[in-house]
Curated annotation (Swiss-Prot):
It holds the Pfam family Ribosomal_L31. This is Large ribosomal subunit protein bL31. PROSITE patterns: RIBOSOMAL_L31. One of its GO terms (biological process) is translation. The lineage of its organism: Bacteria, Pseudomonadati, Pseudomonadota, Gammaproteobacteria, Cellvibrionales. InterPro entries: Ribosomal_bL28/bL31-like_sf (IPR034704), Ribosomal_bL31 (IPR002150), Ribosomal_bL31_A (IPR027491), Ribosomal_bL31_sf (IPR042105). SUPFAM superfamilies: L28p-like (SSF143800). The keyword rRNA-binding applies. Belongs to the bacterial ribosomal protein bL31 family. Type A subfamily. Binds the 23S rRNA.
Length: 69
């Protein structure tokens, strides 16, 4: 078998925008930042909240309400 062909497998940290920190192991060499996690996602929490990134919903509604008039 060939030696040293496997990627390096080390510790990494995923930080959520809600402040939750998840420590795991991965071949990814750097820490990452995520928008939602299991602590703040509406499916897991049971609370309904709108995750609107940059007013996309408003732009969509504005664009298609003009056409329907």
């Amino acid at each position: 078998m060939k030696e040293d062909i496997q990627p390096k497998y080390g510790d990494m940290t995923a930080t959520c925008s809600c402040g939750n920190v998840i420590k795991t192991r991965s071949t990814l060499a750097k820490d990452i930042h995520v928008d939602v996690c299991s602590e703040c996602h509406p499916f897991y929490t049971g609370k309904q909240k709108v995750v609107d990134s940059g007013g996309r919903i408003d732009r969509f509604n504005k664009r298609f309400t003009r056409r329907s008039k």
